[in-house]
Amino acid sequence: EEKTETEQEATEEAEAAEGEEVLTVWCWDPNFNVYAMKQAEALYQKEHPNFKLDIQEKVYTDIEQSLITAAEAGNYDTLPDIFLMQDYSFHKDVANYPEIFTELTDSGIDFSQFSGGKLADSTVDGKHYGIPFDNGATIMAIRSDMVEKAGLTVEDFKDTTWSEFMELAKKVVDANGVPMLTSSGGSEIVIEMLQSAGASPMQDGEVKLVDNAALKKAIEVYKQLIDEGIMVDYTDWDQYIASMNKGEAAGVIQGCWIMSSIQAAEDQSGEWAIVNMPALDEIDGATNYANCG
């Protein structure tokens, strides 16, 4: 019996679906991570036309909670094939929930193409459990127009300590009526402060709170930023990005990937400048540089 045109199309679609190779990925930030996933899918499809990447946007806190829930329930069917992780969570999660991760050491991936610093985040006991995704060099992006309104220049914010930054930031807050910094509501900025001084909240795989001068100083700085209205904290990612795009904050300290979200506000073109982050006061080895990927 000869098939109708509609039946033939349905058959072809079913056959195509059977041949599809689909992987699911969880990630956040449509301007950077989601965009990169779409580009990766398109590149891979050139040689694998039946491949499809099911990209599901989830904020990182939701991803981590889903990982914990699945691990504690012993039900991994709810998890995707691929998920993005914050650098600073990798060692903790591999140690606590090793069954979630697939060892990639002998996968055929040439890990020599990646920098040692980034590989260290996803390497545990000499074994690879992830693939570096971005460089994430920390930047402080500031609104040059808001800074100038306070009688300051972008140069004033370069190579500062946190105490110096606080005094400058107060002037910007007073002149513009908005916080100097916006934050994504996590521990990222505290981790970046620690990294900038070559410090960590961990030692030998355990949390080190006692005799950790850098951690104490970082928490003091964070508290001052919030208490004095210099920084506003958002737990919602969209609100965090909107605070930059709508001029509700004069700056942000984040991995350099945040620039794609800043650039989404085309009406602010030419009004942003990049400097390095402040260094912790009175901490040996403190610098103005860190990483957040």
Which role fits each region the language model picked out?
Residues 1-24, 46:
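Short, low-complexity disordered leader/linker segments with a strong preference
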Residues 16, 84-139, 166-168, 197, ...:
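Hinge/lid segment of periplasmic solute-binding proteins
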Residues 18-30, 51-56, 81-82, 129, ...:
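Short, well-ordered beta-strand elements
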Residues 30, 84-89, 186-187, 237, ...:
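Beta->alpha turn/N-cap motifs
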Residues 43, 47-114, 149-151, 250-251, ...:
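Extracytoplasmic "Venus flytrap"/periplasmic binding protein-like
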Residues 46, 52, 122-188, 200-235:
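Helix-loop-helix "hinge/cap" segment bordering the ligand-binding cleft or interdomain interface
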Residues 46-47, 52, 73, 224, ...:
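Extracytoplasmic/periplasmic substrate-recognition and gating elements
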Residues 61-65, 199-265, 269-271, 275-277:
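Extracytoplasmic ligand-binding clamshell segments of periplasmic binding protein
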